[in-house]
Regions:
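Catalytic-core regions of core metabolic enzymes
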Residues: 1-627
């Protein structure tokens, strides 16, 4: 089922609507009645009217509605969702909290909610959600204080409070949104569903998100990878630290997961990652309004030397390049600018430049074929107003079709000019580094959207019974990590592993090594020795190594160790050996310095032999049980 009617409903029912001051039910009703183009139906069995609208007792009396917003207590919410499903309502937003974020009882309640929603194939947002905003139909189905301005950014967040803060800030900046979704606990709909929906929406130019965790990593990567071919996705992913992950778990019940895995997965999906809120929206403004650069070479044009140097440093910090102008460009700038100006990049038109001199320099810099983007930096001067310069920048950017970011280093004097630039889709900032980072976001999206990715490897020959058996045996021994059985585990997942075997005598080691096609490596099998090379407990040799016939031992802090001269290994073939402690009595004693150059090492702490050949080919289930 698509999400079209979630974002463009004609009739919305509010279950739990009320006139009680300070209540969520009243806030949702007031927000819907303020701008919503459709019809709002209050549902409350205990009153006849809410805010001048006649109420109905339950969803069986609402007639056809496209969306039900649920603001009743959690003990009642599941029955309301069930009734919505029975009445054929496609979309439900559960604002009610008290589910998976509250502990085991709430988690059980959330599982039941999910089961009900899935039974009726409902598009369910939440629970524990602020609600949903769709500016295309003027719908504010939230209990937040602000309606979003109309725009082309779609935004999802696991934090409802963050949405209220963002809307307050964005309204002041004049930044608009297409859709805004408070994901809540993501019992049914999650980031994958909204990424897909907004990827298909021609009115969404950029997708932004604040996430504490991603439930189905592979599915999200697949969905995002398809969308980011055309539509940029920028995320702030929190819970990066141990303390942050713990806080995320208490906030929405989210398991934050491995930071390294998120970094790799988001990169594979073509998702841009912002470190903070400012960077999130700086990137969004550039991506929503500017073309992509054809090269990484940036031209900086400024009327102030110091800020120009700041911008130049930021170019290098971002991994971009300062454009090297052609001789024709340098000649042209030399004619347009006074001798005291700097015609090389960064171009300094100096502080007495009027709008005509600035315009000529911008035009010439953007005309250079090596320039992929430009950053215009200006400080307040008496001979030039920011409004005059903003009009020139809008004109030249449209003429050349190259991305431009602007740094107007002023306060109130720059506000009107910034509004002019923002209306034209040109980002404007006070800090030169922010302007350059916005250009870097364009470069990053250009590269990620055109990058070819290998499809994820799929292993059809997976034996879950073998994996379960290996792990259960290790758990039965009280072990928290596995040793050589790791190769069996990888093999059970269909992952190729080197050939080899576990042996318990020099003769067996020699026999296995000689049967391996290629060089051989031998290592100790002992749960007490993690870094075997530190104590000489591993060795390698080529196939041409002569096989000695004697056995020696030596003592160290790890106890007596059996040394068996043998061939050893290599890059892709291995032979492991383990000798029980009882066999060491027949060995002679030697110092570590007398250990032969090529030997296998077996820790005396191995009181039994590992019989599982860890590098062997896949065995059948019956063969494993027969061993």
């Amino acid at each position: 089922m698509g999400l079209e009617t979630l974002f463009a409903p004609e009739r919305v029912a509010v279950v739990g609507a009320t006139e009680r001051d300070g209540s969520v039910g009243r806030a949702v009703m007031e927000n819907l009645l303020s701008e919503f183009a459709g019809e709002t139906v209050p549902v409350n069995p205990n009153t006849d009217a809410v805010l001048g609208l006649e109420t109905v007792p339950d969803l069986t009396r609402t007639g056809d509605v496209d969306l039900a917003v649920v603001v009743v207590p959690p003990s009642v919410a599941i029955d309301v969702v069930r009734q919505a499903g029975e009445e054929g309502i496609e979309n439900v937003v559960v604002i009610t909290a008290g589910f998976g974020e509250t502990g085991s009882e709430g988690a059980a309640r959330e599982r039941e909610l999910r089961e009900v929603a899935e039974r009726y194939d409902l598009n369910l947002v939440g629970p524990n959600s602020l609600g949903v905003i769709a500016t295309g139909v003027g719908m504010n189905a939230t209990f937040g204080p602000d309606m979003a301005l109309d725009g082309d950014i779609s935004f999802m967040s696991q934090s409802g409070a963050f949405i209220t803060a963002v809307l307050d800030w964005a309204n002041d900046r004049g930044i608009g949104f297409r859709d805004v979704v408070s994901l809540g606990n993501k019992a049914v709909l999650d980031e994958r569903d909204f990424v897909r929906a907004w990827g298909d929406d021609p009115d969404t130019d950029v997708v932004l998100g604040y996430l504490e965790g991603i439930g189905e990593g592979r599915a999200f990567i697949d969905a995002a990878r398809e969308v980011t071919q055309d539509t940029p996705i920028v995320l702030v992913k929190s819970g990066r630290t141990e303390a942050g992950a713990h806080a995320a778990a208490s906030h929405t019940g989210t398991i934050a997961g491995s930071e390294a895995a998120y970094e790799a997965g988001l990169d594979q999906a073509g998702v841009l990652r912002a470190e903070n809120v400012q960077e999130l929206f700086d990137s969004a403004e550039a991506l929503a309004g500017q073309p992509l650069p054809e090269s990484d070479d940036v031209a900086v044009v400024t009327n102030a030397g110091g800020p120009g140097v700041m911008a130049t440093d930021a170019v290098g910090d971002a991994g971009l390049s300062l454009a090297s102008f052609s001789q024709a460009t340098l000649d042209q700038l030399g004619e347009e600018l006074p001798e005291t100006a700097n015609i090389y990049n960064p171009v300094d038109v100096i502080g007495d430049a009027d709008v005509d001199r600035f315009a000529a320099a911008i035009d010439t810099a953007l005309s250079d074929p090596t320039v992929g983007a430009a950053c215009i930096v200006s400080c307040p001067v008496a001979v030039l107003t920011f409004e005059e310069l903003a009009a020139v920048i809008v004109e030249k950017q449209a003429e050349h079709g190259k991305p431009v970011a602007v740094c107007f280093m002023g306060g109130d004097s720059a506000r009107e000019a910034q509004e002019t630039l923002n209306a034209a889709g040109i980002p404007a900032y006070f800090d030169p580094a922010r302007a350059i980072r916005s250009l870097d976001a364009l470069r990053e999206f250009r590269d990620s959207s055109t990058r070819e990715y290998d499809p994820a490897a799929e292993y059809d020959d997976v034996d879950p019974d073998a994996v379960r058996e290996i792990l259960q045996e290790a758990a039965g021994r009280g072990e928290t990590r596995i040793g050589v059985e790791a190769m069996d585990l990888l093999s059970a997942y269909g992952i190729p592993v080197p050939d080899g075997a576990v042996v318990d005598s020099p003769d067996d080691a020699r026999e296995v090594a000689e049967s391996i096609d290629g060089d051989v490596v031998m290592k100790v099998v002992s749960p007490d020795i993690l870094h075997k090379s530190d104590i000489g407990a591993s060795a390698s040799a080529s196939r041409t190594t002569r096989w000695p016939r004697r056995t020696t031992t030596w003592s160290s802090a790890h106890g007596p160790t059996s040394l068996t001269p043998t061939s050893s290994a290599c890059r892709s073939r291995s032979c492991w050996t383990s000798t029980p402690a009882s066999r060491l009595s027949s060995a002679s004693t030697a110092t570590r310095s007398s250990v032969p150059s090529y030997c296998s090492v077996s820790g005396a702490s191995s009181s039994k032999c590992w019989r599982t050949p860890p590098f062997a080919s896949r065995r059948s289930r019956s063969e494993r049980r027969a061993r």
